[in-house]
Structure formats: C-alpha cells, structure tokens
UniProtKB/Swiss-Prot annotation:
Protein's name according to its UniProt entry: Origin recognition complex subunit 2
GO terms under biological process: DNA replication
Known partners and oligomeric status: ORC is composed of six subunits.
Any single GO CC term annotated in Swiss-Prot or TrEMBL for this entry: nuclear origin of replication recognition complex
Species in which this protein is naturally found: Dictyostelium discoideum
Presence of the UniProt keyword Heme in the record: no
Amino acid sequence: MEEYTDSGEDKNVYSDDDNDYFTASTQNNRTSKNTDSSPLDPKRLAEEMSKIQPKHEKEKKKLFESYYKTRENEENGADNHCFKFNKIYTDLKFDYSVLVSGFGSKIQLIETFVKEFCTDGPSLHFKGYLPNLSVRDLLYKITFSLFGIDKKIASPIAHCNFIKSIFESGSMDINKMRQTFGGRFDYGIPDHVYVVIHNIDGYSLRNETSQLTLALLATIPQVHMIATIDAIGAQLLWDNRMLSNFNWTTYSMPTYQPYDLELSYDTNTKGGGGGGGIGSKSSSGTNKNLQPSTILTVLKSLTEISTDIFKELLTYLIKKKKNKMEFKILFDICRDAFLVSSESGLKTQLREFIDHKIIIQKEIGDTTFLIIPIETSVMEIILSQLENSIS
C-alpha cells in the first residue's frame, strides 16, 4: 500500500506505520483563545438591527386575528366559541388562571385581549421581564392603585394576605374600611380585578418567594390572573401546591413578533460584554447604552400621561442644560399642567421609568433629584421624535 505524502514538509502525515499514530497524538494541540468575535458597539448594533426588514407581516397579522373575532371571521360564519380569546375569558370567569406560551412577543396579544374583553373591572399590568422588578413592587401597586393604601408591609406573603383580607371585607362600610386598612377606597372594592404578568418566568420573579406570593394572590376569587411564559421548562418553577393555587389553564398562542420591548433592557443583547446594557454608565455619568430607540420603545407601552410627564422633564433639562431636576419642581410643573394631583401620583407615574433605569432617583441631603443619564443632544432627539409623533 502506498504511503500518502505531499510536497510539503508536514511531519504529521499518516501512513501504515503503527508508530505514526502515537507520534502524531503526542503533538500539542493548541486552540486560539480568540475564537469569539468582539461584541458590537451598542450604537452600531442598534443601527444594524434597524436595517432588518420585517418579514411575513401578512401571515403574522392573520395568525394574530385568528385568536379573536374579526369582521372577516364573522363574515365566514365562525362561532364565538371557536376563538381562543372567548375561551380564555370563559376560563377566567370559572376561576382559572390563564397561562399563555408560544414563540414571539405576546405583549400586544394580551393587551388586546384585556382591552376587548376585560371591561368589567380594573386591570393591572406587570412587566416580569424587567431585571429589577420585585414582587413587593407588584403588591404595592395593587394596594395603592386599587385602594389608595400607601404603606409597606413586612413580607410579600403578609402583604398578599393583607390584600386577601381587604377583598374578604367587601360587605364592610367604606368608612370602616378606611379606618381598618388606612386607604382611601374611592372606588370601593371591585368585583373583578385582572392581574396581567408579562413573563411570569422573568429573571426577577424566578425565586420561590415571588412564585409562592403570586400563587397565593391567584387564590383570591376576585383576582383573575393572566400570565405569559417564554423560558423552556418554565413550569418547573412550580411545585404541586403552587400549581393547585394558580389553577392554570394553558394556551399556546405563538405570534412570531419580535421581542423588542422585552429585550430593551437585556445586557446580553446590547453588546459590550460585562457591564453593557441599559444600566451601563460612562465615566461622565451618562448611560452610554441608553439609546433614543430604547427609550421610545419603552414610551410606546406607557400611558399618555406618563409620556407627557417625561416630556416636561426633558423640556426642563434641555432648557437648563442639565441632566437632573428636583422632584418638587417637576411636581409643581405637572400639577399646573393637570397631569397629577399629588406627589404619590407622580411617583406612581415615574415608577416605569425608574424600573427601566431611564430615570435615576437620588437623594442629596433633604432634596430628591430625578436624573436622566444621557447627553443633552440625546434628550433633544427624543423630545423631537415625541413631538413629531403627536403632530
């Protein structure tokens, strides 16, 4: 048998000689440590991603509309019970909690369902994909938004039991409830409350305390819970007791929509390795990765009042050429513009911006400052786009 050789001087050529195997295997195999490409600069990454054209928009829209009754579906003679939105609403009324899975962002899907179907009570929406959302924040929003109770309770479980006791006292006189629980109770106690949790499997809610608390919250008869999941194996978060309390009925409803909002905070998708993402600051005190597109994406999910408050803040900072403003000054401006009537109301409106680290709240002495960690030029771009979207 002929031995294979080439014109080069490669010493690791294999032949029929048995000893050649051991000769070759003793050579050191070194692998370069520079196998990974360097992450893109966040600004460059945003520019490149903006060039990606959406695909299959007609098919996505048709899929989205297949979940609920549209004029086209009605003309085709489809019955209401054929649509998942109708089934979900029925399940909620039969004391099930609803868990929605499927590839693609489901924010618009769930928001549409709540807007069209859940009209017999208030709805509270929570963004489980926020890295710093805590179950305490969620419970506080429930007690403050529904009952006007502004107080902190020792533990999440105790807070949830406190909420449960409020709902159980529905037959109590309003004045007595105010004395007992300390809230305003301007609208009494609603018969139906819809609690929406986008990404209940989000990083900040994956701990046992959070899931135990949410499961306990789901046992309140007046509370109808709607949640979405995206992580593979998310249901491993719950033991048998939690599953019994949640009482899930599950729906697969893929949308194939991009996860723009969910990933707007994610450091792993912003480039820059460690320290990248929304919360990364430069030595000048500005957040080098907080881009206008990121802020505008967040603003799309907020109310008109929240957007107007943010515009007032931007206008003041641009005029003063600063990146911080006293909370008291912003409150006076917003009160005069009839955007808020109390400081607690302003704090509630600012919560979303603080959660996304678009606004940083800092105490200096006895004064509370609100800081937007971006350059004035970036503020001007954002304000200009906000005003153009209105005009």
